[in-house]
Amino acid sequence: MTFKLFVVVTLVLAIYVATAEEAMKDDSEPAERGCIKYGDRCGSPHGLPSNCCNDWKYKGRCGCTMGVCTCGPNCPSRGCDWSKKG
């Protein structure tokens, strides 16, 4: 009985740790959780929010332009890869 309890507790801990590691990966941009990635649809034409993701690794700006998250100098929020400028 003690061995079975040990196995169950070990499995539960393993699942908990694996889930926590996934959550830590998602926290790389905590302020941008739920934001829309570059190239995805956004804005009122699609009935979606306009909050495009900021990517602090790149210079430039990113925003919702004509219903798609694109990069450009006049977009409202910082951070986009200029090589993917829309």
UniProtKB/Swiss-Prot annotation:
Cellular compartment(s): Secreted
UniProt key word Ion transport: no
GO cellular component, one term: extracellular region
Signal peptide (from-to): 1-20
Tissue specificity statement from the Swiss-Prot or TrEMBL entry: Expressed by the venom gland.
GO molecular function: sodium channel regulator activity; toxin activity
Membrane-spanning residues: none
Keywords: Disulfide bond, Ion channel impairing toxin, Knottin, Neurotoxin, Secreted, Signal, Toxin, Voltage-gated sodium channel impairing toxin
Positions annotated as propeptide: 21-33
Highest taxon in the source lineage: Eukaryota
Entry keyword Disulfide bond: yes
Disulfide bonds: C35-C53, C42-C62, C52-C71, C64-C69
General function of this protein: Toxin active against S.frugiperda larvae. May act on sodium channels (Nav).
Domain writeup: The presence of a 'disulfide through disulfide knot' structurally defines this protein as a knottin.
Assigned protein family: Belongs to the neurotoxin 39 family.
Listed name of the protein: U2-sicaritoxin-Li1a
UniProt organism field: Loxosceles intermedia (Brown spider)
